């Protein structure tokens, strides 16, 4: 029979006891992590969200409490009353925040019992993720996940305080909205009242926050849930959280300045890390040239080296043919990696092939000489020129890819990050930010044979590029900007189109007919004709930001109830079938693909 809490009130969290509390009577409540019977004295670690406290049951002090302790098992919920005392000499546990003190229990209440658990709730016990997700209510008791979610809550509070102090209004936008093409698939919600019609869960509040600017709210923010029905990976979820912001009567510099202040405050308060401001910037073109990707990790070097002009006239036919057909040749210098075995180099080659490379040429530099199957195709002068371009020294490993520009940049850019992981160059406790600016406005979709928006259809072109959107769309740049942290895009934004004729032109460039545009975006086009101010904004991926702040390997470790990579909640068993009555009310019939 469990005890009743009665009039007991918790006086302290377990993890907050210090030497300053010695001599005080305290009431603690929590879960028993472990119990140890020393043949008289019984010790237990009591856990709550703030940490652990060691509690001691001494039969010489209180037989009733000691009798209760004999019945206690792991994960029992208990409340104890007792005196905080210093630990005896030689028993101080410096690994515990409360390791200098313990609580000598005078009264104990067993509030609830626990059956044997499927896994131990110690952080250091390795448990398969599917088991952890099935028993998420247990997994969330583990200190590492509790600390992750406590930090997440802190970041939300810092965000609200900072943005409110800077004149932003927190305004909610609808979850049940209209399906519009924004890149990924929508989650659709059937309407019972308007049968045959569907709502869509928002992929972002993009259009609504722009309409709020048209409505005169000037500065908006929201910590908002968004939904995308897309294939998942370690840093993606079907439902995710954004710190969403929009501002009127501003330019790019205004947005960047305010948002740098937000990120700096988050890192200072939540992590104790000072972020130098202003943050570095580079254009999209520079990022691709130097790093091969538009989200470069600038914690380390390994920059790509452009070699096309050096090798296009050389005797190595593979390189010469690629250059002659409009391709490029780039390389990177893996400093000190000439020690890599042939198998290790083969593994790097296979990795590069994942991103389209047909192969990976390599050169080991030892005793001032090139050691490579391709060395014989280059003159001493060409080798010297390449060595200079690479900054090559004895012990280095030079890696080359020759192909179409996109393949070269993708494969070497990803290989660069892969090598940094192998070489231990990417320290999780080092934080390096960079803004990427001047993105292309449009990119050609080879599969659909049409232009597609690089960011989204509401991004404004650079003023000087507006006149060539129709005549030369591939050369137009966008007023777009991403914030990248340690190779992860944590925020993306842009100045928006605020003139109706420009927005109509953009929809036309994306292949939408006038009828399609009116059907999908008519309300926005009408609003744009009613006095729309210049405006822009940004959205930060909160899940990814918290993942980086905590050093977690997956955003599933910073979300209370995440989905698997198949979009399932193993705990609640969602998604699940619904009964026939619900389907009839919605005028729906389910057919299953064979």
UniProtKB/Swiss-Prot annotation:
Q: Which GO terms describe its molecular function?
A: aspartate-tRNA ligase activity; aspartate-tRNA(Asn) ligase activity; ATP binding; nucleic acid binding
Taken from the UniProt entry, a GO cellular component term is: cytoplasm
Q: Which UniProt keywords apply?
A: Aminoacyl-tRNA synthetase, ATP-binding, Cytoplasm, Ligase, Nucleotide-binding, Protein biosynthesis
Q: Would the keyword Secreted be found if you checked this record's keyword annotation?
A: no
Using the UniProt annotation, give all residue ranges assigned to the region (Aspartate): 206-209
- State a single Pfam family of this protein: tRNA_anti-codon
Which compartments does it reside in? Cytoplasm
Q: What is its main location?
A: cytoplasm
Q: Which domain of life is it from?
A: Bacteria
Query: What PROSITE patterns does this protein map onto?
Result: AA_TRNA_LIGASE_II
Per its record, the protein catalyses: tRNA(Asx) + L-aspartate + ATP = L-aspartyl-tRNA(Asx) + AMP + diphosphate
Q: Which GO terms describe its biological process?
A: aspartyl-tRNA aminoacylation
Say which family it is in.
Belongs to the class-II aminoacyl-tRNA synthetase family. Type 1 subfamily.
Q: What is this protein called?
A: Aspartate--tRNA(Asp/Asn) ligase
Native species of this protein? Geobacter metallireducens (strain ATCC 53774 / DSM 7210 / GS-15)
């Amino acid at each position: 029979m469990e005890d009743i809490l009665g009039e007991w009130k918790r006086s302290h969290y377990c993890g907050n006891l210090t030497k300053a509390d010695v001599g005080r009577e305290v009431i603690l409540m929590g879960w028993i992590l472990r119990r140890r019977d020393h043949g008289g004295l019984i010790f237990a670690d009591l856990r709550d969200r703030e940490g652990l406290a060691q509690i001691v049951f001494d039969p010489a002090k209180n037989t009733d409490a000691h009798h209760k302790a004999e019945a206690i098992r792991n994960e029992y919920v208990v409340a104890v009353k007792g005196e905080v005392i210093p630990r005896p000499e030689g028993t101080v546990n410096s690994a515990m925040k409360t390791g200098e003190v313990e609580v000598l229990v005078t009264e104990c209440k067993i509030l609830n019992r626990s059956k044997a658990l499927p896994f131990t709730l110690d952080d250091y016990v390795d448990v398969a993720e599917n088991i952890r997700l099935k028993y998420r209510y247990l997994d969330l008791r583990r200190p590492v996940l509790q600390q992750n979610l406590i930090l997440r809550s802190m970041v939300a509070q810092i965000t609200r305080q900072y943005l409110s102090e800077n004149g932003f209004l927190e305004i909610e936008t609808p979850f049940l909205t209209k399906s519009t093409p924004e890149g990924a698939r929508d989650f659709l919600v059937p309407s019972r009242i308007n049968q045959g019609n569907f709502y869509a869960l928002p992929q972002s509040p993009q259009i609504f926050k722009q309409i709020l600017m048209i409505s005169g709210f000037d500065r908006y923010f929201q910590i908002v849930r968004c939904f995308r029905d897309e294939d998942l990976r370690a840093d993606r979820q079907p439902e995710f959280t954004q710190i969403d912001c929009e501002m009127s009567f501003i330019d790019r510099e205004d947005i960047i300045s305010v948002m740098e202040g937000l990120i700096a405050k988050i890192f200072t308060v939540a992590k104790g890390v000072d972020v130098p401001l202003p943050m570095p910037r580079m254009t999209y073109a520079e990022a691709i040239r130097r790093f091969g990707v538009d989200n470069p990790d600038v914690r380390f070097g390994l920059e790509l080296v452009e070699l096309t002009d050096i090798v296009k006239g050389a005797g190595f036919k593979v390189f010469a043919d690629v250059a002659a057909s409009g391709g490029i040749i780039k390389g990177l210098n893996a400093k000190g990696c000439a020690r890599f075995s042939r198998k290790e180099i083969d593994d790097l080659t296979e990795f590069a092939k994942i991103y389209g490379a047909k192969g990976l040429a390599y050169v080991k530099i030892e005793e001032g000489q090139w050691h490579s199957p391709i060395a014989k195709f280059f003159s001493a002068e060409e080798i010297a020129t390449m060595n200079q371009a690479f900054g090559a020294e004895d012990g280095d490993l030079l890696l080359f890819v020759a192909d179409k520009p996109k393949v070269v940049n993708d494969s070497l850019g990803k290989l660069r990050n892969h090598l940094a992981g192998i070489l231990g160059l990417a320290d999780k406790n080092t934080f390096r930010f960079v803004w990427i600016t001047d993105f292309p406005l449009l990119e050609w979709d080879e599969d659909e044979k049409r232009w597609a928006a690089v960011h989204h259809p509401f991004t404004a072109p650079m003023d000087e590029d507006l006149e060539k959107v129709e005549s030369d769309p591939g050369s137009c740049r966008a007023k777009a900007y991403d914030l990248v942290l340690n190779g992860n895009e944590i925020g993306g934004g842009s100045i928006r189109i605020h003139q109706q004729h420009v927005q109509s032109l953009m929809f036309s460039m994306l292949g939408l007919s006038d009828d399609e545009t009116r059907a999908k975006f008519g309300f926005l086009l009408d609003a744009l004709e009613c006095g729309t101010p210049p405006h822009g904004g940004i959205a930060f991926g909160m899940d990814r930001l918290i993942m980086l702040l905590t050093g977690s390997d997956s955003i599933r470790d910073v979300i209370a109830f995440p989905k698997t990579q198949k979009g399932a909640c193993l705990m609640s068993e969602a998604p699940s079938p619904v009964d026939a009555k619900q389907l009839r009310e919605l005028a729906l019939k389910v057919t299953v693909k064979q």
